Amino acid sequence: MTLQLPNDPARSDVLSARPTLWINSLYRDDAIGDTCLPLVPDQVDVAQSDWERLAPLLETCFPELKKTAGAIRSDLTELHALREALGYGGGEFGRVFAKADSALPVAGSIKARGGVYEVFVFAEELARREGLIGDREDIRHLASAEARAFFSSYSIAVGSTGNLGLSVGVAARALGFEATVHMSSDAKPWKVERLRKLGVKVVQHEADYTTAVENARSAAEDDPAVYFVDDEQSRRLFLGYSVAASELVDQLQTFGVAVDADRPLFLYLPCGIGGAPGGVTYGAKKVFGDNAHCFFVEPVQSPCALVHMMSGSEELVSVYDVGLTNSTEADGMAVARMSAFVATVMRNMLAGVFTVDDASLFRWLLLAHEVQGLRLEPSAAAGFAGPGFIVKHPQGRAFCERLKLSDRLRQATHVVWTTGGSFVPQEQFDQFLEIAQASRSR
């Protein structure tokens, strides 16, 4: 189908695949309180309780979690030097931080928050339903030989461009499940190889992410022994991500950062299908209220959330419908059509979306490594454009004027969510750096 986007200041840039900022005209206060939404804020608290209950089991399955007592957490780092290198040294940029999910244990990306959560919650649910574990029994029994033998007769399936597949595959194999990951043509070879070394069956499709998910769903739906992790519709994935915002509250307090009407918080979240950034946004709105303003960031050729939300269509819109290619080196964001579930939840909750080109991703990846010592994959560097768009772009300035934030930007906090990279093999990371250095020397 061919789609005509409505008249909007960002329209021309979007259609021409130029970096731009789109502001959501439907963004409003207290959107999380909308009773028509398909979930309620209390479900974030339930997810937090799930994580705490599962922590002893996670620590048993993953020795790297011993130092956090089974919690999957990432550091918050203030970017003193990198902000200067990025051109954000002026006082009008407030304080700039990175939330380093790029170094999350277990799976090395933000997808550990969703994929591990869903697999482990399902495992507990299945074990209790089948009488493998009682209400008062130690949750660590699910890591026993008996439990592994039980789980081995079940399989977990998922469709992925890479990082969600890694997260689900690692979690499933840790408990003894069989696992199948359907991967799109955008998936990086090293991610495929890593999964296969874990004993995960990888089915590669010569098609995009949406097709890989559809094939995974179709293959799973007729087999009662297969549990499908549905990246397009899963509440569990979404809620697993949402708990990250509570983690951020404590970390900001450690830096002496308060978030209130006079000290706004801006979050910049790389977006593929939308589950991870949508979950973090929902959690942020729960804990910070209307003082948090969340922006998705997408590649110029794959802005699926921007295109759909700008269109105002009740039907899902694809980037192909507006003549874009869905071609990008940011494999985790190479998604043509956003999640309908996430689109519904974000309708009034998301402040906006900005887009970036691949050359900028590599430039920021190199700067982050040289100046801050961060190890990122291209998609994880996307959020670094955020402060510039808010403070300098005409639409960013208009947004701040409309919300009466312009005079408060010096007290603002910007958090760039770096979403993956620590598991990238050294050879592949060196190639990223070479691409960036070659571009710099031109």
Curated annotation (Swiss-Prot):
GO biological process terms held by the UniProt record: D-serine catabolic process; isoleucine biosynthetic process
EC number of the protein: 4.3.1.18
InterPro entries, per database record: D_Ser_am_lyase (IPR011780), Ser/Thr_Dehydratase (IPR050147), TrpB-like_PALP (IPR001926), TrpB-like_PALP_sf (IPR036052)
Cofactor: pyridoxal 5'-phosphate
Lyase is among the record's keywords: yes
UniProt keyword Acetylation, yes or no: no
Any one GO molecular-function label of the UniProt entry: D-serine ammonia-lyase activity
Pfam families named in the record: PALP
Gene3D superfamilies in alphabetical order: 3.40.50.1100
Reactions this protein catalyses: D-serine = pyruvate + NH4(+)
Keywords: Lyase, Pyridoxal phosphate
Modified residues (N6-(pyridoxal phosphate)lysine): K111
Family statement drawn from the similarity comment of this UniProt entry: Belongs to the serine/threonine dehydratase family. DsdA subfamily.
HAMAP family noted in UniProt: D_Ser_dehydrat
Protein name per the record: Probable D-serine dehydratase
